A protein has these predicted regions:
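Bacterial N-terminal signal peptides that target proteins for export
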Residues: 2-17
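A detector of low-complexity, intrinsically disordered, Ser/Thr/Gly/Pro/Ala-rich segments
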Residues: 7-10, 22, 124
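Hydrophobic helical h-region of N-terminal Sec-dependent signal peptides
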Residues: 15-21, 25
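Sec/Tat signal peptide C-region and signal peptidase I cleavage site
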Residues: 25-31
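Hydrophobic small-molecule pocket/channel-lining residues, especially in calycin-type beta-barrels
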Residues: 31-268
């Protein structure tokens, strides 16, 4: 699963890109769990577009909102502004139709750089994001957004109609019965905790400030909730296919269940 509440902000949203995958074992042994192993994101089978969000002009700049529990103010003056989960963003405008932003963690480490270009007719925005990972590598994402309403310029409601990402690897293990450990190698992030709904803090050098709580409704399924500072930012459900070869992670923002993102992973 991808913590889109943390991630979408930098492409709106790419800089908080934290991919977490949960697993469930219950009373079964780790060897019997269908979640244990190495998983690779199948970009072609995944559905990553469809989300809507807005930029609203304010007396001092703009306010971003995902229409759910994520909202923050910023200006295009190059200064750092707080967003969520301990992240900051700085924006600059270059001409009438081009914007650049830089997302950082609480220690000032650059997480993502985002370049946005608005079409001449003001109807389409192309967004290119470069994400900087903890292992020293980078990856690029390209999004196409269409204006739903509003304008001119950045202001208005937008919908993502195309999202192009690079694949990544997830490693899942079961250290003990009723516990899951997930590792994201390129982010050097670990999520380890119980499957009884108890919140577990995300660990890692550039991890966001937040917790994920898991529950197990079935042997091949779990539900999860990501929260930061007491506010639920994202929810989801992960399911392993009956043949054990595919993991499907469906996620959404609270109150926006009609805009679900679907990530499909192949077992390696």
């Amino acid at each position: 699963m991808k913590l889109r509440a943390v991630a979408r902000m930098s492409r709106t949203y790419a800089a908080f890109s934290l991919v977490l995958l949960a697993a469930t074992v219950g009373a079964a042994s780790a060897a019997e769990s269908p979640f244990v192993g190495t998983w690779q994101l199948n970009v072609e089978k995944s559905k990553l577009a469809g989300e809507t969000f807005s930029y609203t002009a304010t007396p001092t700049g703009f306010q971003y909102s995902n229409g759910s529990t994520v909202k923050f103010d910023f200006a295009t003056d190059g200064k750092d502004y707080p967003v969520i989960a301990g992240r900051t963003v700085s924006w600059t405008q270059n001409g009438n139709n081009t914007w650049d932003s830089v997302y950082k963690d609480g220690h000032g480490t650059v997480l993502s750089k985002v370049h946005r270009v608005l079409s001449a007719d003001g109807k389409t925005m192309t967004v290119i994001s470069t994400d900087y990972h903890a292992d020293g590598t980078t990856s690029q994402e390209t999004d196409i957004r269409e204006r739903v309403s509003g304008g001119p310029g950045l202001a208005g409601t937008w919908k993502e109609v195309k999202v192009k990402v690079t694949s990544h690897t997830l490693i899942i293990s079961m250290p003990s019965a009723g516990h899951v450990k997930y590792e994201n190698p390129r982010q050097k992030q670990i999520l380890e905790g119980p499957l009884d709904g108890t919140p577990s803090r995300v660990q890692g050098p550039i991890a966001p400030e937040g917790t994920v709580a898991f529950k197990q409704p079935g042997s091949n399924k779990l539900t999860w909730t990501f929260a930061s500072k007491g506010t639920v930012l994202q929810q989801g459900e992960d399911t392993v296919s009956s043949d054990g070869k595919t993991l499907t992670s469906v996620s959404w923002f609270p109150g926006k269940e009609s805009e679900k993102t679907i990530e499909v992973f192949d077992k390696q």
